[in-house]
Swiss-Prot record:
It comes from Mus musculus (Mouse). The modification Phosphothreonine is found at T266, T276, T287. One of its GO terms (molecular function) is MAP-kinase scaffold activity. Keywords: Cell projection, Coiled coil, Cytoplasm, Cytoplasmic vesicle, Golgi apparatus, Phosphoprotein. This is C-Jun-amino-terminal kinase-interacting protein 3. GO terms for cellular component: axolemma; axon; axon cytoplasm; cell body; cytoplasm; cytoplasmic vesicle; dendrite; Golgi membrane. The lineage of its organism: Eukaryota, Metazoa, Chordata, Craniata, Vertebrata. Induction: Expressed in neurites 5 days following initiation of nerve growth factor induced differentiation. NGF withdrawal results in the down-regulation of MAPK8IP3 protein by caspase-mediated cleavage.
Amino acid sequence: MMEIQMDEGGGVVVYQDDYCSGSVMSERVSGLAGSIYREFERLIHCYDEEVVKELMPLVVNVLENLDSVLSENQEHEVELELLREDNEQLLTQYEREKALRKQAEEKFIEFEDALEQEKKELQIQVEHYEFQTRQLELKAKNYADQISRLEERESEMKKEYNALHQRHTEMIQTYVEHIERSKMQQVGGSGQTESSLPGRSRKERPTSLNVFPLADGMVRAQMGGKLVPAGDHWHLSDLGQLQSSSSYQCPNDEMSESGQSSAAATPSTTGTKSNTPTSSVPSAAVTPLNESLQPLGDYVSVTKNNKQAREKRNSRNMEVQVTQEMRNVSIGMGSSDEWSDVQDIIDSTPELDVCPETRLERTGSSPTQGIVNKAFGINTDSLYHELSTAGSEVIGDVDEGADLLGEFSVRDDFFGMGKEVGNLLLENSQLLETKNALNVVKNDLIAKVDQLSGEQEVLKGELEAAKQAKVKLENRIKELEEELKRVKSEAVTARREPREEVEDVSSYLCTELDKIPMAQRRRFTRVEMARVLMERNQYKERLMELQEAVRWTEMIRASREHPSVQEKKKSTIWQFFSRLFSSSSSPPPAKRSYPSVNIHYKSPTAAGFSQRRSHALCQISAGSRPLEFFPDDDCTSSARREQKREQYRQVREHVRNDDGRLQACGWSLPAKYKQLSPNGGQEDTRMKNVPVPVYCRPLVEKDPSTKLWCAAGVNLSGWKPHEEDSSNGPKPVPGRDPLTCDREGEGEPKSTHPSPEKKKAKETPEADATSSRVWILTSTLTTSKVVIIDANQPGTIVDQFTVCNAHVLCISSIPAASDSDYPPGEMFLDSDVNPEDSGADGVLAGITLVGCATRCNVPRSNCSSRGDTPVLDKGQGDVATTANGKVNPSQSTEEATEATEVPDPGPSESEATTVRPGPLTEHVFTDPAPTPSSSTQPASENGSESNGTIVQPQVEPSGELSTTTSSAAPTMWLGAQNGWLYVHSAVANWKKCLHSIKLKDSVLSLVHVKGRVLVALADGTLAIFHRGEDGQWDLSNYHLMDLGHPHHSIRCMAVVNDRVWCGYKNKVHVIQPKTMQIEKSFDAHPRRESQVRQLAWIGDGVWVSIRLDSTLRLYHAHTHQHLQDVDIEPYVSKMLGTGKLGFSFVRITALLIAGNRLWVGTGNGVVISIPLTETVVLHRGQLLGLRANKTSPTSGEGTRPGGIIHVYGDDSSDKAASSFIPYCSMAQAQLCFHGHRDAVKFFVSVPGNVLATLNGSVLDSPSEGPGPAAPAADAEGQKLKNALVLSGGEGYIDFRIGDGEDDETEECAGDVNQTKPSLSKAERSHIIVWQVSYTPE
């Protein structure tokens, strides 16, 4: 029961009364209590109340113990029965799985045997095919050898044939010489022979039929008349010329004929021998074989009969080879003596001398005819032309046996030569027959080879068909394997159904499987089985992770909506027996063994809070039930609220237990102890600087559905307002910054103290101009808004405006342009790159740049103050949006993002530790959009935009941009869930968007390093932006740096010195922003599914938190060595009780280092502050860390967490301040009683001093604990710096008081049907502000 009392000073005293809750006792205890009650009534009636006054508490205690033991016994029996049933089910399932495994093994053995049998059959077929192939190859080889032998035999026969031709030619020449010699010998007696034989009847010779070669190599025609062969233009003009060129002239025709036919043949008139090489002439000096054989047969018929002549003529069809030795042999003489006589006769007779000119003319003027063999001077065509021009009578005379040899008689010894010629012709005919037979055999062999080649082609086709069938079978096997995996997945899904359905499906599958023959069942190899098992293990691992997340989510939801009824309730029996002493049903207020916690809160002064400030920290309206999916009646809702209050009451009772810890300023502090220090054991004074809570209130009271997402303090470093030109815009008044007013009024120098989390050891610390102004991102069902407050006056909202209609996930304050920033041109290629080569690829320090660097002056973007800017375009269908209003606003975006991330197989352990040489970096260029029209419709509503769209600034009426809204000044960068990035000014005209760009995925984190802004996207890429030449941010050119797979996101980033640490999956990538290279990668957690969520840096240490993990890990900033592990779950369980409100599952949702403290926010709304120490004392007195100093390292100690770590400053500079490692000890941890109902969304630290403004009025009175409430005004106090730490989250709770809804009973007592508000004040989004004093390092 909540009671509120007003004191005279205007303050409100609020305290909590305990009262009983109605719980039913067991029947046995109730009956026993009734019996004892009646007995007590009888005793009181007889003897008065004093008799049972001392006895009744003992009896009540016994009954309570009995009731608790009885309930525990019943629970144990129920649990035992459940365990027995589970055991039986497990045994049954084990037996069934065992039988199924045995069946599967048997089937696998059968499959393997069938596969082996099929493999053997295929092997036999392959061997058979190989044997046939070898046989065919052997046959082909034999045929090739036979063909080669036949070709050799054919060549040999050709050689023999040529030899026979040569011999035949020689014989013919010898025969012709013999005939000519015989004629020459019989020249003298020819006249006598004719006179002695006057009555000899002979036939006339054919006209001009002379076959005897003369000296000039021409065959002469004698008969009268001019012979004009066809085509001859060298014929003789008249008979006189023909007769003058002959060897002899006869006075009459008869002598002319005999002289012409008996003329001697001489090689030349000059007597010289011809040197013409050996040439081939046709047989009997005739070229056309078929036409020239007939006259030659007639010529031979002098010694043979007509039949033999015809046989020789028909069988002679080859050319005669004339050897070179026979070219100088004279024709017509048998010896040299006879030739000398003839030569003398020729020389003495001028008529016998042939004219050289005529011979030359006759022999050299025919292009187609002439002497073939110059050695013998024979005209090969003369006989042919004579026969062709002669009539049929002459040819008939020749066939009948004309006397070609004239009147000469032939001797008998010449008939033997003709026989030999006939034998040669017969042998020639036999050789021709043999040749024809060989040709027939050759043709048969060629046909056989063709047949074998065809058979080989057929076999090749069959083999190719077998290969194709094999490929088809392999594809079929793969399809069956895919179907098997699909069926397995369906079976796994079916296992999750009720057990009866699974059994029915299993029996059905077994029945169907039995119907299929063994040969047709699916087969898969051992490799496939191993792959399936590996995939199953991966799916199991992912399923366990998802079950863990679901378990945590269900635990939180159940703790809110369906809390379990507690076992032990002391007030039940007391309420039953209280009726003995009082007739009133209302229980008396219970006495406390400890003083009640009072909260004094005075009204603020004029300079401080406004009058609409709440009167007390816990002045909270009636609580309401959380968001429910199904409507419940009023009775169920009341029971749920009652159970929730009981849970918070148990937490309150546990917190109030005296465990030796101190309570001061709303914190649970450990007992004081003296901490060892390197100086000699002086007491550490940091324990005295306890954070003081100064403010707690809903951020926006008008809209109860507002949710907080993120926040950031304004960083004004590097910005000098007095340098701005007043003509270009309104000059910011220094008084507009409340922090500036307060510090100037107090006489403090402006921003002279450095923020400890922003210090860098290697550069000169400059004046930190961090403002006390804080930008907080809130969202409703439709829009996201920015609420700007001053931490010194958190109750006053400076300004608020709408950003977009999607959730804004991150915000970061970017300082003004500084001389220490990287030059803007370093991210471009060399200046000599042609701007027109838009497709050129360049390499810059190992970075792949896509496109070319065009140094274009893009006008600065500007978005007018709008309430509904970026609408999700069609190309971004995968990005979640809340425009339709169907997304649950209470669902955390980080949980939604976790659900979309799928763990990949990832590299091996060895690959995980290696550093990649360089990420894939893409240089993106976006074309400037055209100047928007006068309409106020945003450019993002066109619907045709793509990733990288730039919204350009709207030009003011004056045509110039105000310098106060220039992005060269401090700016605030906001990243939305739909991929939009907004840039607003942090100094003036906050509502005006200076730049905006659409990226390809959700923006999750933003950091700034020396003129570079790194934007982490949900697809695992980093977008790196830089300033332009004029100092303003240029969003038209940026780099995309790919860190991994697109289904893993970069969840967090932190600036460590001049490096950026990126949390990607379970790894931390250390990136150099200047070179855009990954310098180092290491695993922050051994499991790939455990993602890095928060990073906090100070000095030489970086604290890292892991998703769904309560352990914080400390890593060295330079060596990346794992230094310390801190688990907060035991501490939270000890402070708030194990299992209370689902606190057994602790996860870290917010992390910050401020005021020399490590601030930790959990998913349960608990805020923990751990002082940072230079040394950590373990239980055995061992030191965990030492102060860093300027000495050289001596050894490499500290290889594991808990060892001694020696850290040394930078040796390159003597002026560099030595940094320290921020160790933490849970023995010094401090838990704040002020927390949130849901997860702590963010921590923000800004400089400020609220205590001076409130004149000592704080939320928790300093008198509660011995800790100081405000810094002392002595010399030590002048060195202390003040900082304000803000936390934001859903709802508010004080763990010392409980739910804070006890006043709801009184408010709702009068009207039972009163409708409760949709969201109580305690469940709205709250911000809590602490002030902490610390000594700068």
